[in-house]
Regions:
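Compositionally biased terminal segments of proteins
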Residues: 2-166
Length: 166
């Protein structure tokens, strides 16, 4: 969301990622995150894996949530990473570039395109019904359409919504 709408500091409680070509198990995810957290970077931030758990927002949304703690003494911040596999990205993922906060460089990640993000948000609203939908889903739909609606390819959005609701 942040990269799509240009809000680099969008408040969020977690990170979401979809992986390809990987069997999603607690053991494998725990091993990978422990390895990543052990990487030393000269920024005084230390990450600690607190645990892993299954997540199922619906039966069609299996995944694993990794609970982490980011330590930058004296600050300690909890965060989570929700990991899924097999999500349909229509037509394909795209590359986003992020500027580092404390370093004069960028990193690139493959991420959902605008139409797939909108399709997933719309599907969440429709499947949960109005009484159970999270306010941030409505906000995300509004902000995506308000800021990037003119760039949204309607045919791609339709295909993405069809694939998301299969």
């Amino acid at each position: 969301m942040s990269a799509i709408v240009g809000l680099d500091t969008r408040a969020t409680m977690d990170l979401d990622t979809t992986i390809k070509g990987f069997t999603l198990t607690h053991e494998a995810v725990l091993s990978i995150f422990k390895d990543v957290c052990a990487v030393q970077i000269d920024d005084d931030v230390q990450f600690e894996v607190m645990g892993v758990a299954d997540i199922r927002e619906t039966d069609d949304y299996p995944g694993i949530r990794v609970s982490l703690k980011a330590n930058y003494p004296p600050i300690s911040v909890p965060l989570t990473v929700d990991i899924t596999t097999g999500d349909m990205i229509t037509p394909r993922e795209i590359e986003y570039t992020f500027s580092m906060l404390f370093d004069d460089r960028t990193i690139s990640v493959l991420a959902y395109n605008l139409e797939t993000v909108l399709a997933e948000k719309l599907e969440a609203v429709l499947s949960r019904n109005i009484a159970n939908t999270r306010p941030r889903d409505y906000y995300d739909i509004y902000i995506l359409y308000a800021l990037r609606g003119a760039e949204c390819d309607k045919a791609t959005l339709r295909r993405a919504l069809e694939r998301t609701t299969e």
